[in-house]
């Protein structure tokens, strides 16, 4: 990151955070506590675990300051339905919950540890419009294997195989729509470490009801699908 980018980052932290003065201390790893709480100007409390990897801080910067899943170019109702697949610890869901207080947000996170932090964030911020589920989303309903990344709490995957793995419950996108009687989804956000391919390629009924999709695609599961497959698929809806 060049000096101009760093300056812009620090200025963004002042714009976003009430306790912005903590931000550079975390950036330069000058705080020797297990965690800090960032307080946003719209009154969100965001817990950041401080460890050697610094991944929590990096994800906070990405979600709150860089906003890769920004819906600014989308037309979204004041009372939208938003589905967050790969919620992690809830940063995106919290952002949308504050921005759209009348929204219904369905948040899916398969990793139990991340899910517990998601629940903590929801409770601490009293966000009653976030509906959390300790589920993976894939092309099947039932048990699936989730491979655990020891180094990166955002890297747990159905496809990036590691020695550490657990069985988790999975649900399809079509089942999510049917169970919750969703007739229109204003935004689907996908960050699911390779599962985005099988989700989108096997959800024809749901895709008809989705207005906007914001996704991160990964170089995983490429033996079965490619980014071109997703693009061709979505052009039909």
Task: Please annotate each region the language model reported.
Residues 1-237:
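Phosphate/nucleotide-binding beta-alpha loop and adjacent structural elements of enzyme active sites
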